[in-house]
Structure formats: C-alpha cells, structure tokens
Amino acid sequence: MIKIKKGLDLPIAGAPAQVIEDGPTIRHVALLGEEYVGMRPSMLVKEGEHVKKGQILFEDKKNPGVVFTSPACGQVVAINRGEQRILQSIVIEITGDEQVNFDRYDRAQFTQLSREQVEKNLIDSGLWTALRTRPYSRSPAPGSSPKAIFVTAMDTQPLAANSQVIIATDKEAFVDGLNVLTKLTEGKVHVCHSAGSLPNVGNNAQITYNQFSGPHPAGLAGTHIHFIEPVSATKTVWHLGYQDVIAIGKLFTTGTLYTDRVIALAGPQVEKPRLIRTCLGADLLELTQGQLKQGENRIISGSVLCGTQSDEVHHYLGRFHTLVSVLREGREKELFGWIMPGIDKFSITRTTIGHFLKNKRFAFSTTMNGGERSMVPIGNYERVMPLDIMATHLLRDLLAGDTDSAQALGCLELDEEDLALCTYVCPGKYEYGPVLREVLTKIEQEG
C-alpha cells in the first residue's frame, strides 16, 4: 500500500449517500469538444441530421484515425463554436434507440484477441477517446503503445462517489475491460484503488492491483503514475477511469456502445445528495431540475476544485466526469471579512476558527474572498503537494513561462487536476491549471 500524507480533504457539506438511484429522463446530450486537448474536428454531420448511437460525428484532423461517436440516438440540434471556430459542443436531442453494432466476442476469445482487433474496435466505437496519455493528456495516436496503462479505480475528489459501489454493480464487465486493455501494452495494467476488495482477474499476470490511502490527491491518476511508473519526455503511459473500463468490457461482449454513467450529484445546494445513474453527456439542467435549493446556484460538471462551470453551451456532463457539484453563487461582499473570527469559514492556515473545527462541514460558496495579487510562498503549496516536486519553484516557473526549468522540475508528470489544490490554497488567487496547459503545449510544440 502507498500512503499519501500530504494533501487536503476539503470539508465541504453535501456529501452524497452511496446508494445508486435512477436519474430523471434526459432529453438532450452533448459531446464537448474542448475536453480533448489539441483536438481539431473534421465534421461528418450537420445540424438537423439524424444520428444513431455510436455513429461517427467527427474525426480529429491532428490525430488521423481517431473518431468521436454519438452517445445517443437522435437529431443533431446544435453545433456550437467559440472563438476561432473552436468546437464547443454538439447537442443531440434524444429520439429512438437505433445504434451502430460493433465487433463482439465471447470471453473465451479474449486471450486470442490481437492488438489490432482491440484497437480497431475501440476506435470504431469512439471508446479510444476514453484513453489519455501522460504526459500531455491527449488521445493516443492509433498504432502507438504505452509503457503501461493506469486504471483509476478510486476517487478522492470532494463529494465523489465510492468507486467500489459502482464497480460492484458490473464486476464481470470491469474484469472483461481489464483483460481487453492488456492487449494494448506489453507492460502492466495498474489498477489503482483504495481500501476494499475489487473483482478477481484470475491468472492474468499483466494486471496488478495497487492500493493507495490518504487525503486528496491520493485518488488522481497523476499521483498513481508518479509513485509507480513516472513518465518523462521519452516515456509515455495511458490512463482511464473505471467506468470507461466497464464500457470497454461491455463493448467487447455485446458489440454495442455502453454510455451509462453513475455520477454523484452533491454539494451544499443539493436537496438530496446521492448517486444517480444517467448517461454520458447528459444535460445538467435537466439532470438537476427540482433537485436544488432555492437561490442562485452554480452547477459544475466535475469537482469543485477543477470542474467545468455550466453555462449556455457547456451545461452537459463532461466525458471524464463522474460528479456534478452545486454551490451557491457568492455575490455578496463582506466588510472587514479578514478581521472576523471565521467560525463558518475554512482555511488551510490558522487564520480562522474554522481551521480548528476538524469535524465541521462547511457550506462553501463561489466567493473568492479577494482578487489576484502577488504569489506569496508561505508553505501552502508544499502542504497539499504529495509528489516529489518542489511546488513553489515549479509554480513560479509556470507563471513565468520558463519551459526548460518547469520541465526539469517535473511539469510533464502533471495535468490540470494535479494543481487544483495549489490553486485552492494560493493566497495570490492564481489559476495554475490553465498556466500549466500553456506550458505543456509550448513544450510539445518545441519537441
């Protein structure tokens, strides 16, 4: 077992009951283009066109052969684009249940599957895009091979679902997915999990279980990769979530695209925080209708630390998200708030009474309590960074755009979510995720 000592479990109210319920009927789903780093779409459908579930919507120009498929059957009602015609979302109104069929196999055939067969089925179905590389967090190029594959079978983000509850409902599909993934690498398939039992994978020596414990970010792929098989400019691994492993298992045994998602609907503004079974790309306005407390709320696809804010074209469940968080919009200003005792405020430093109330859960809002200011190194970053990285020096170099120094300090091991806690505890109110992405893009372009 690998025990993480540094980090932070945010004491936020509204944790979900770990019981799965069926969610409301969803009428619209969407595929969000901005979730895929560096992707440039070549559209294969138009607004008003009817599509089947699993039908190709577009192909990535920068990664030829990688296609993106429809998560539901219905009509394409909107293709939203932003600045420089960046694809924001493709919205589908669900009608009917037609779907594309893919290759299916008996479990007894899994050991005879070739890498080419597995890759073809994943690409054709669109499940290839569930895989992400580290470094750079891109969809892998067809024909490439990683040193290892990491399956994130735990989640330590604030308000997250217990992954073992969800895996227990589809044990066979999870094991099938793991066995299929072994065909994509000559290395190990590392299943990273928290305390508790997971399904037995039999005698497949390629699959290894790695137990992690401790505060967030103990459940992030970046943490697992750092402690088991660190990456570099010349070493690449892939990672994916446990629900995508289940979808891969069902694809190969049924020949159909499985797009169900079990998510946690949680947060201080949710009336009944719980686990909900819904679908990939679900409309968050439909999903949360009648579920929230009165007032102005912010709906977030993903964690409160690094999720995507719901807005006019982004109010859909993200491809890599298993959590919908809801916070109150904090628009009020507090006079001399810095001098108050702060019994209802949490701080990682000893500046509020809330810091000492270890069992209290706080109704966080979106209030930032101040604006952007100088970066002050007072040890906060080191408290929440469990990786063997000099956090303050790295963050300083990221802000300065020093790619050489940032690379030497380990930025290639990181993704935006790995710096989310640094953003939260930063007294200067800097957003380190977007800055990291700019530096990674520059490093990749420079070769």
Swiss-Prot record:
Subunit structure: Composed of six subunits; NqrA, NqrB, NqrC, NqrD, NqrE and NqrF.
Classification via InterPro entries: NqrA, NQRA_2nd, NqrA_C_domain, NQRA_N
Root EC class: translocase
Organism expressing this protein natively: Photorhabdus laumondii subsp. laumondii (strain DSM 15139 / CIP 105565 / TT01)
Matches recorded under NCBIfam families: nqrA (TIGR01936), PRK05352.1-2 (NF003759)
Similarity section: Belongs to the NqrA family.
Alphabetically ordered keywords of this record: Ion transport, NAD, Sodium, Sodium transport, Translocase, Transport, Ubiquinone
Keyword Transport: yes
GO term, biological process aspect, one: sodium ion transport
Reported function: NQR complex catalyzes the reduction of ubiquinone-1 to ubiquinol by two successive reactions, coupled with the transport of Na(+) ions from the cytoplasm to the periplasm. NqrA to NqrE are probably involved in the second step, the conversion of ubisemiquinone to ubiquinol.
Record HAMAP family: NqrA
Catalytic reaction annotation: a ubiquinone + n Na(+)(in) + NADH + H(+) = a ubiquinol + n Na(+)(out) + NAD(+)
Protein name, per record: Na(+)-translocating NADH-quinone reductase subunit A
Catalytic activity, EC: 7.2.1.1
GO MF annotation list: oxidoreductase activity, acting on NAD(P)H, quinone or similar compound as acceptor
